Design a protein with these regions (language model features):
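Conserved glycine-rich cofactor-binding loop
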Residues: 10-11
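The beta1-alpha1 cofactor-binding region of Rossmann-like NAD(H)/NADP(H)-dependent oxidoreductases
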Residues: 37, 61-72, 104
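A glycine-rich helix->loop->beta "capping" turn
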Residues: 54-56, 76-89, 95
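Substrate-binding pocket helix/loop in short-chain dehydrogenase/reductase
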Residues: 98-99, 106-108
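Active-site helix of classical SDR
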Residues: 122, 158-161
Length: 295
């Protein structure tokens, strides 16, 4: 079994992933931004769940907008467990509204959480993984960088940046025996606080200028609900199950990308072609080594 650090485990996909891995016997460092404050209830509930499972749970505070926080969380894993095998990048936040109405601070803040946050955690974890010449980075991304729905502009941009960072980082860390898997969930309107906890644009004056579109924005949740077969609803558990499945695969056999999309938007086909095109270009450049795991 592996020692796994997961970001953003208070709700949704992160919570389901922590529970699934605990049920399989892994040692899980379930991190939350404020485990002793606003996330204390979630931490307590996860602790109660873990009490009857074969895995070992450790709750840790981790704010992905702070390098010091990321460093401290990873160092705690090393100090207590002796090693770190897997990092699951899951922490993220949603903004809904008119793109023009998001200030530069709004956009910077979302990119900081959804993209730069994973980079901070990598900077904390990779020295240990490189030293062992093994490990796995799992990125919980989104199909949204392909489907690009309206009224979610900054979120789309942040998830595209997150995906790009995952790809370019994979080239380099593969040469130290570190695998990368990007799991791309489709929309999951229920079972998370993603939509209910979404932030809005700060510029009220610009937002008011788009008032004619307010009725469309109000349909965002309904529109996403309509994507799914009532018999096959989108569920955070389906994503958690895929992360868990990937971690059971032998070294060198983990998929670089896996799409988990109950909406069946065809993103798997798009990304398969995109990755083939990217890999072909990297080979044309003469850097084919970075596409292979160096053991």
């Amino acid at each position: 079994m592996s020692t796994v650090l997961i970001t953003g485990t208070s709700t949704g996909i992160g919570r389901a992933t922590a529970e699934t891995l605990l049920s399989q016997g892994h040692t899980v460092y379930a991190t939350m931004r404020d485990a002793e404050g606003r996330d204390a209830t979630a931490a307590s509930q996860l602790g109660e769940f873990a009490a009857s499972r074969p895995g070992t749970l450790r709750i840790a505070g981790l704010d992905v907008t702070s390098q010091a926080s990321a460093d401290a969380a990873v160092q705690r894993v090393i100090d207590e467990a002796g090693h770190l095998d897997v990092v699951v990048h899951n922490a993220g936040h949603l903004f809904v509204g008119y793109t023009e109405a998001f200030t530069e601070d709004d956009l910077t803040r979302l990119l900081d959480v959804n993209a730069v946050g994973a980079h901070r955690v990598n900077r904390a974890a990779l020295p240990h993984l490189r030293g062992r010449r093994s490990g796995t980075l799992v990125y919980v991304g989104s199909t949204i960088l392909v489907t690009t729905p309206p009224f979610l502009g900054p979120y789309v941009a942040s998830k595209a940046a997150f995906d790009a960072l995952a790809v370019v980082t994979s080239y380099e860390v593969s040469q130290f025996g570190i695998e990368t898997s990007i799991v791309m969930p489709g929309a999951i309107p229920h079972g998370t606080n993603h939509f209910s906890g979404a932030s809005r644009a700060s510029d009220a004056q610009v937002t008011a200028a788009y008032a004619d579109l307010d009725a469309l924005v109000a349909r965002t949740n309904e529109a996403h609900d309509g994507l799914f077969d009532p018999e096959r609803p989108a569920d955070p558990q389906s994503v958690a199950d895929e992360v868990a499945r990937i971690l059971t695969l032998p070294e060198g056999c983990k998929p670089f990308r896996s799409v988990v999309d109950a909406a069946r938007a065809g993103v798997d086909h798009v990304m398969a072609f995109s990755d083939l095109t990217r890999e072909a270009f990297v080979r044309r450049l003469g850097f084919e080594e970075v596409l292979e795991l160096k053991r």
